[in-house]
A protein has these predicted regions:
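Conserved phosphate-donor/acceptor-positioning beta-strand/loop module used by diverse small-molecule
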Residues: 91-115, 119-128
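Hydrophobic anchor at the beta1->P-loop junction of P-loop NTPases
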Residues: 6
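ATP-dependent small-molecule kinase phosphotransfer cores
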Residues: 32-89, 102-103, 114-117, 134
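Hydrophobic positions on the alpha1 helix immediately C-terminal to the Walker A/P-loop
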Residues: 17
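A short, basic-hydrophobic beta/loop patch
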Residues: 205-245
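Conserved glycine(s) of the Walker
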Residues: 13
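Short alpha-helix boundary/capping and kink motifs at helix termini
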Residues: 177-219
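Small-molecule kinase domains that catalyze NTP-dependent phosphoryl transfer to phosphate-bearing small molecules
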Residues: 117-168
Length: 245
């Protein structure tokens, strides 16, 4: 496979994973975020302002999308760091990185390298992350009739909220290798701390772990014992069989 598409939440670690992968394999990175930041700067806007500005004007999205699609038709080994690259480069290993909003806020607020996304306080950062996410979901739904939160779009979903950088990097790299070799791998890895269990759960040892994603929350439908065991053992990730979106 010559193409990897890397989508996910703001602050989920997409750039970190992409840089790790190119250190292990002869790929180069094409970043939609960089293209959009350049366009925003050209218009004298912040990333959030530019997202809102283009909600009803698809020409900027089409410019970036056409660039991705054209590169996706080549044999060059490319990692596409882009929310929608999985859609425009269908012949790819499609990765989605999730992170909860509180962890994303901490990461982005404390990352002084994000010149275009600097904030005076954490609450402002948190609200802008939420607003930007809503803006992007609306834009992609309106322009492409695509739901970024539909996990069936991806080959690998990883929750980076409570996993270490090394854990995430290793999991992504090993999963890509397994995918290329036609071997089985864990397709969905979520933090047990991100999973919500109702009171008086039944003892369901041996059940598949099935999650219902509703209003941005991961609610356990089956597999309570697996989640409890992962929490007791201090696991940063637990293998999930199904996420209903």
């Amino acid at each position: 496979m010559n193409h990897i598409t890397l989508s996910g939440e703001l602050g989920s670690g997409k750039s970190t994973v992409a840089n790790y992968l190119i250190s292990k394999m002869p790929f180069r990175i094409v970043s939609a975020g960089l293209l959009f930041r350049q366009l925003a700067a050209k218009h004298g806007m912040s990333a959030k302002e530019f997202n809102e500005f283009i909600e009803n004007d698809p020409k900027y999205d089409h410019y970036v999308d056409d660039t991705m699609a054209e590169l996706g038709r080549t044999d060059e080994k490319i990692i596409f760091d882009s929310r929608m690259a999985w859609h425009f480069v269908p012949s790819s290993f499609k990765i989605y990185l999730y992170v909860d909003v509180d962890t994303a806020t901490e990461r982005i607020f404390n990352d002084k390298g994000r010149v275009s996304e600097s904030y005076t306080d954490k609450e402002t950062a948190r609200q802008e992350i939420i607003d930007r996410r809503k803006s992007e979901l609306l834009r992609y739904q309106n322009f492409y009739h695509c739901n970024l939160d539909d996990y069936s779009n991806y080959d690998l979903i990883v929750d980076t909220s409570h996993a270490t950088i090394d854990e995430v990097n290793t999991l992504v790299f090993n999963s890509f290798q397994a995918f290329n070799e036609g071997k089985e791998y864990t397709r969905i890895g979520l933090s047990p701390k991100s999973l919500i269990m109702e009171k008086n759960e039944p003892d369901d040892t041996g059940e598949k772990l099935i999650i219902n994603k509703k209003d941005g929350r991961f609610i356990v439908e089956k597999g309570f014992s697996r989640v409890k065991k992962a929490l007791e053992n201090g696991k940063s990730l637990v293998a999930v069989d199904v996420v209903k979106c």
